[in-house]
Amino acid sequence: MTLKEIIKKGLELGLEAVEVYASTSESNTIKLDEGKLDSYNIKELFSVSIRGLKDGKMGYVTCESLEDGLVEEALHSLATTVEALDATEPEFMYEGGSTYAEVPELISDYKEHPTNEKIEMLKGLEKALLAKSDKIVKVGYCQYSENYNKVQIMNSKGLDLSREYSYIVTYAGALASENGQTVIGMSGDVNTKFGNLELDRIVNEASEEALSKLGAGSIETGHYPVVLKRDVATQLLSAFSSVFSGDSALRKMTILADKEGQKVFGDNINILDDPFYEKALIQSSFDDEGVPCNKKYLVENGVVKGLLHTLKTANFFGKAPTGNGQRAAGSITARPTNLYLQEGSLSKDEIIATVENGIFITEVNGLHAGLNPISGDFNVQSSGFVIKDGKLDRPITLFVLSGNFFELMNNVEEIGNDIEERFTGVACPTLKIKSLAVSGK
């Protein structure tokens, strides 16, 4: 059954509007272990999510094929389900006819390179890591993957959109060992061109990270000036990104629900959601509802400018939809496209040089389990380095970093200029925080 036929059949069953979201994804993953091929996995997934609207109520069904009998059964189930729904807020479908921005094509050349070439690349990566030091005893997670996605959205209101993209990912971990202690350093690269993979950078970063962790000790409990590595700052921003969602506001799960126009963050904090951000891997012209995407400030100079909205939450709050509707199991929620904290002017090393006695946090574990997205509180096991006289002094591990996201964002003293190139979803540069609580020995 074609997408148009699905829509026609849904309307015949009494639905006022019907939308079809067809998604195709392919991934090939090659893993190497001790110079030998460990696994080669190929995944191909296809799904069709069908939404039906009647009397302001929206129902959802999903099929894994377009086989006539399967789709007809799903449509009958959808029509019955919508009738039985008891929705509290009306839902909507977006009409066609909007103008959409042009975005750069993101298509990888991985099909031009044979599998054997990719395996040899991984072998060379593993060999180069082992050659870095006698203390590097093994290479783990030596992996290469290819990813392809295609989406088509069509509805009975004239919407007909499609997008596709593909990219490759390579990463590896160097395991270093000394005096009975084993640590790991990871690095990777996301790219579209196989020949542009930054293998030398992966080798240098993974080996240096692993070797620098050897001999890690403890630190005294106290409050310290803290520098968050960009990876850690990104994890933190990502973990609390739901506070900017209109869905969270609708469920009263964010303190920002009624804070538009109010100063909640520090003067130097600017947080944007920009579907066209040049440092992001994927740029989008429309969301999963077909609404045009646009660049917007969520926080500007510390002032909350607005939240991310779907058609449903925008209607509830009397706002315009922001082009941030994303599908999760058929339903639509408001999520960021490319969310980032705007860069400053200093490099990571320049920021570290401003700290006389503090901590550089390079790794956090169990972040989602140790935070409260409503209050903003977090407690996470961490690792990093002592900073002494503006330089990294010694590695430390197994301490707990505690604080509050909103308080932290009011105590950012320096912002780095090092947002990661080709990031996906959320990004943040290196941040220097005035003080955070550390529980050590």
Residue ranges with predicted function:
Residues M1-S284, D288-V291, E300-V303, K391, ...:
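Active-site bordering "gate/hinge" segments
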Residues K259-K441:
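Dual-mode signal for accessory low-complexity, basic/Gly-rich regions
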